[in-house]
Amino acid sequence: MKDYTLNTKCVQAGYTPGNGEPRQIPIVQSTTFKYDTSEDMGKLFDLEASGYFYTRLQNPTNDYVAAKIAALEGGTAAMLTSSGQAANFFALFNICEAGSHIVASSSIYGGTFNLISVTMAKMGISATFVSPDCTEEELNAAFNENTRAVFGETIANPALTVLDIEKFAKAAHAHGVPLIVDNTFPTPVNCRPIEWGADIVTHSTTKYMDGHGAAVGGAIVDSGKFDWMAHADKYPGLCTPDESYHGITYAEKFGKEGAFITKCTSQLMRDLGCIQSPQHAFILNLGLESRQVRMPRHVENGQAVAEFLEKHPKVEFVNYPGLKSNKYYELAQKYMPNGGCGVVSFEIRGGREAAEKFMKNLKLAAIETHVADARTCCLNPATSTHRQMNDEQLLEAGIPAGLVRISCGLEDKTDLIADLEQALATVS
C-alpha cells in the first residue's frame, strides 16, 4: 500500500484477504503447523522457504500486524515481541555481544535504562549515556572502537525530552553503527524516525498503538537502509556464517532489507521465545485501525492540560514539548509538527509529599504504571517506573523526586482540567 496515505494504512495495510476469506485478520490460535513431507518442513528449518512451523518464532496473525507497522513506519521488515522491553532488548542484542558498547541517551524510560546499564552489563555489554542536549563533539566523544549501536527515544519517558534524531543519526553513521529509536510516544502517526535517519525503530505497542490498556506487546521495524556487510567486522552475527542454521550468512542471503529481522526472528525468537500471542496481536490491530483518529485527541488534551498547569501557581514547572516555552519546542515542531503525544510531566511545589497528596485526590485520573491509554492516568516516576535510579541518575534524566507524569486520555479536556484543578486545591 505504498501509494496510500498513513490514515488508510492504519486501517488496511498488512493484510489483503482473498476471495471468500475473512475481512478482519484471522486469529491463528495454533502452536504448530502441518506439512505434507519432512522435506517441506526441513526447508523451513534451513530458511530456504517461507512459512510457519512453530508459533514461538512466527505466526500469521502476528505477521499481518507487523507488516502494517512496517508500512506505517516506512520500513522494509518488522516483527512483534511480547513487550516493548523485549523489542528493545532484541533490537540491541541482535547486533551486540560480550565486549560490545552502546551509546545511549540518558533521558529514556527507567526500565530501558536498567536494561542497558545493569542487565546487559552482566552480559559483558557496556554503555555510555549522553545527554540528549549534548553537543556533536560530546556525542562523538562517547563512541569507542567497540560501539555497535546508538539508542534513544523520540520523546523520552517521563522527562518529555525530544531526541534530535538527525544529530544522533549523523554521529552513529559517522562511526559505522545504526541508530535505534524507540518511537512509542509519538507513534508513526506523528513521527517517522526512519525519514530522519534512524535505522531501527522499536515500540511498546502496549501504549498508544493498542491504546486501550488491553494487550501487552512490542514491535521492531527495520528501515532496510543500514549496510551490514559494509561494516562486517562490527557485526559478525549478521555477516559471518551462523552455525546454528547450517552456516547461513544473514546479510548475504537476505540483504540489508531483510537480514536484521530474519536473524532476530529465526535466532533470538528461537532461543528466547519472546513472542506476542496471536490474540494480543489481533487486539493490537484493532487499536491500530483507529490510531490516526485517536492520536490527535490525545495531543489536544495534552496541550490543554500543559497550558493549564503552566499557569497554575502551585506548579513549579511543566514538561511538554508542545509549549512554546519548552526548550524542545523547536525540535518538536521539526520532527512532530502535528504534535507529539498526550503525556505531560510536571513538578508541584512542595516536592514528593505534595505530589502524592495531589494524585490521591484526583477523581478521573487513576494512579497506574501504565501510560498512553484511552483513560487518563498518572504516577510519580521516582517512586515507580524509575525507582531503581539513584538521586544523581534521576536528576541526570530530568526526573526530580516530586515529578508527576500524567497521561491524558480521550476524555473531554474540560473535565480533565477541572479534575486537576480540584486536586491541586487540596495541596497547601
Q: Can you describe what each PLM-predicted range is?
A:
Residues 7-16, 78-311:
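Conserved PLP-enzyme active-site core in the AAT-like
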Residues 117, 126-127, 141, 145-148, ...:
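PLP-dependent enzyme catalytic core of the Aspartate aminotransferase-like
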Residues 37-89, 111-119:
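Conserved N-terminal alpha-helix of the aminotransferase class I/II PLP-enzyme fold
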Residues 272-275, 279-281, 286-290, 295-297, ...:
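Conserved small-domain helix->loop->beta segment predominantly found in fold-type I
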Residues 74, 314-317, 402:
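Glycine-centered tight turns that cap/initiate beta-strands
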Residues 221, 345-347, 407-409:
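Short hydrophobic/aromatic beta-strand micro-patches
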Residues 32, 223-226, 348-353:
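Short loop segments at secondary-structure junctions
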Residues 1-59, 67:
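N-terminal "arm"/small-domain region of PLP-dependent enzymes with the aminotransferase-like
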